[in-house]
Swiss-Prot record:
The keyword Repeat does not apply. GO terms for molecular function: porin activity; voltage-gated monoatomic anion channel activity. GO terms for cellular component: mitochondrial outer membrane; pore complex. It comes from Oryza sativa subsp. japonica. It comes from the Eukaryota. Belongs to the eukaryotic mitochondrial porin (TC 1.B.8.1) family. This is Mitochondrial outer membrane protein porin 4. Its main location: mitochondrion. Residues 1-30 are annotated as: Disordered. Forms a channel through the mitochondrial outer membrane that allows diffusion of small hydrophilic molecules. The channel adopts an open conformation at low or zero membrane potential and a closed conformation at potentials above 30-40 mV. The open state has a weak anion selectivity whereas the closed state is cation-selective.
Amino acid sequence: MEAETECKVPGVYSETGIPVEDPAPGLNSDVSKKDAPPAVAAPGPGLYFEIGKKARDLLYKDFHTDQKFTLTTYTNNGVVITAASTMKDEAIFSEIQTKLKSNNVMLDVKATSDSQVLTTITTEDLGVSGLKQIVSLPFPYQTAGKAELQYLHDYAGISLGVGLTSKPLVNLSGVFGNKSVAVGADVAVDTSTGDFTKYDAGLTINNSDLAADLTLNNKGDSLTASYYHLVNKESGTAAGAELTHSFSTKENTLSFGMQHALDPLTTVKARYNNHGMVSALIQHEWRPKSFLTLSAEVDTKAIDKASKVGLSLVLKP
């Protein structure tokens, strides 16, 4: 997991609300790069940023080259408190996060070591089943607040995000189809200039053990195809690949990887790309919801350089 050097604001580009997928045995499903709270599985195609998520999680999730410690505690009245500290390049970044849920409202307050505070209020089933509201209010950057509406339907997933400024950035994404086949688009407009800052499109095909995705990104400048295959559900054995082509630079990037559960509590993953980067990790659930992850990265084209090693310890008593 990479250390975040600034207070990330969910909202316009939020991944809050992504349905949690069943992980392979031993694979950490509770700790994600976005720290998104768990949500009920979407009845239909989900939201746009879920296109290609299975392959991305296999290829990139839990690989890290820093050292991170996370401790989560639970109070009797339902408050969840998480303290995390990350060391990278001799710099230490820390944060403390408090979550409290009452009925359908979740209050999330996060304070970081660089004196930033982010308050996020999430309201589920806002008058209509499947409708969610997310409001993010950072401090001291009050003008960077964001509000988002997400709607999940059997045949659609729609998200509308608006920055809380006089001339905000507006982001609209939609996915239409079902759990097997869906198409979607993601568009962002800067209302201060009238310019499109993003326009992406995607296609996804899924079944219980296969996922194939095709996305057009970076305003049409890059095309990404990804593939995920759950080879054996009992052992958690899976394989995946991702190919990205840049039309402007004519450059191709190919990554492929595999994962396998050595036992119900231990998972190994490996990844390789055509630039010669090799990564591997082993993750062990040494007690319920507590994980120790050791990962390493080596540049095979510069083998004389020192390899990078990452360590993550997550404790949930």
